[in-house]
C-alpha cells in the first residue's frame, strides 16, 4: 500500500494507537473507525474523489442500520464488511475494465469480435473486484477489533 507518503501513513499511525481520527481519504474527510489493536493498516487506501461524498453519506446510513442489527449478536465485523464492500462497489473503486485493443480471430474474419472483447473486459473487472474484496476481508479478519465512532 502506498501509505508512507504523508496522509494515509499518518492516519494508519493514529488508527494503530486507537485514537479517534478524522481520516482523510482522497479529497474528502469523513469520520471513520477506531481500531483498537496494533498493526492495522488504514482501511481506506483508495483515492476517493470529492464527488463520492454524497454516496458515502448514504452508505453510512445503511451501515448504521446494519450495525444496529448485528452489534447485538456481536457481529460487528460482518456489518462493517458489508458496508465496505457495498461502498467500494457503489463508487466504482473496484477497478474499471479497459477496452482491449486486440483483434480476435472472429473479429479478423467476420468483424464480430466485439462481444468477446466485452466479455474479457467484464471478467477482468470482476477479477479485480474479488481481489479488492479479498484484501479488505484479510485486513478485517486479521487484526481488527472495531469500535464504532460513526455517530
Curated annotation (Swiss-Prot):
The UniProt entry's GO biological process terms, in alphabetical order, are: meiotic cell cycle
Q: Where in the cell is it found?
A: Cytoplasm
Identify the keywords attached in UniProt to this record, alphabetized: Cytoplasm, Meiosis
Q: Primary place of residence? A: cytoplasm
Record-level GO cellular component terms: cytoplasm
Q: Any idea what job this protein has?
A: Has a role in meiosis.
Query: Which protein, by its recorded name, is this?
Result: Meiotically up-regulated gene 114 protein
Organism classification:
Eukaryota, Fungi, Dikarya, Ascomycota, Taphrinomycotina
- As recorded in Swiss-Prot or TrEMBL, the protein's gene is named mug114
